[in-house]
Amino acid sequence: MSLLSMLFGNKPKTAHLAKERLQLIIAHERDGGGSSANFLPDLQRELIAVISKYVKVNTEDIRVSLEKQGNYEVLEVNIVLPEKG
């Protein structure tokens, strides 16, 4: 490995790195109650409002989903940020 490769190496692209950092996954153990998916539209609207204060994003660039995996519910929030340019 050359000195230049060690110094500059292969760095991940900024958009890909931002996507990885902004993928937020929250899991909680299901308590057997009713479905909690009815809060997703409100959550998505509030996320858009908060994120829009700091970054200009399209509403289509924010995805909120809830999946059941065994005894857990996984809430996934994906936010695609615009490229700096």
Curated annotation (Swiss-Prot):
Pfam families in alphabetical order: MinE
Keyword list, A-Z: Cell cycle, Cell division
Family annotation (InterPro entries): MinE, MinE_sf
Biological process, per Gene Ontology: cell division; regulation of division septum assembly
TM helices/strands, residue ranges: none
Coiled coil: none
Keyword Nucleotide-binding: no
Chain's role: Prevents the cell division inhibition by proteins MinC and MinD at internal division sites while permitting inhibition at polar sites. This ensures cell division at the proper site by restricting the formation of a division septum at the midpoint of the long axis of the cell.
Entry's family note: Belongs to the MinE family.
Protein name per the record: Cell division topological specificity factor
Species this chain originates from: Dechloromonas aromatica (strain RCB)
Gene of this entry: minE
